[in-house]
Amino acid sequence: YSQQQQRKDTLVVTRDGTGDYRNIQEAVEAVRAFMDYTVTIYIKNGTYKEKLVIPSWVKNVQLVGESAENTIITYDDHANINKMGTFRTYTVKVSGNDITFKDLTIENNAAPLGQAVALHTEGDRLMFINCRFLGNQDTIYTGSEGARLLFTNCYIEGTTDFIFGPSTALFEYCEL
């Protein structure tokens, strides 16, 4: 077999078990480290309650939801749980480079009891297309100086300091 035939470049996540994986973290962990080709993870509509981490060795991945309104990644940590502090409250943490999110919702649905990050970014060249980010305080943390982020056609909801951090981020055609 050639290398092209051996690699799997499309994975499917479904809550009902009809796809390759039942949760998104398992699909991310199945991606080979430091790939030079793109893997697309298709995520079917559903609510995925998980604390998703995309590590630094995962790159060139697209996470594509079935719809922004009905493909939901959610968690409910907040800064006042076990003295967690702001930066460990994320629902999704992206440390890998060249990662794209499309047509999905990332939310931190913690009660308004303190900081509760929905998206924590540390990777470079991250793109978010037609996504929704829902939270209260500190919804999006752009965590790495020099990193470049693009948000296009996104909806971002929060109450206090809901976008913060040192990265360079461009928000085009977004509703805040």
Model-derived segments and their meaning:
Residues 85, 98-176:
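Right-handed parallel beta-helix
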Residues 1-5:
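Bacterial Sec-dependent N-terminal signal peptides
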Residues 16, 44-46, 131, 154:
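Active-site-proximal beta-strand/loop segments in catalytic clefts of secreted hydrolases
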Residues 8-42:
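Acidic Gly/Asp/Thr-rich repetitive segments characteristic of extracellular carbohydrate-active
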Residues 22-33, 48-57, 63, 73, ...:
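Short, T/G/N/S-enriched strand-turn elements that build extracellular solenoid repeat scaffolds
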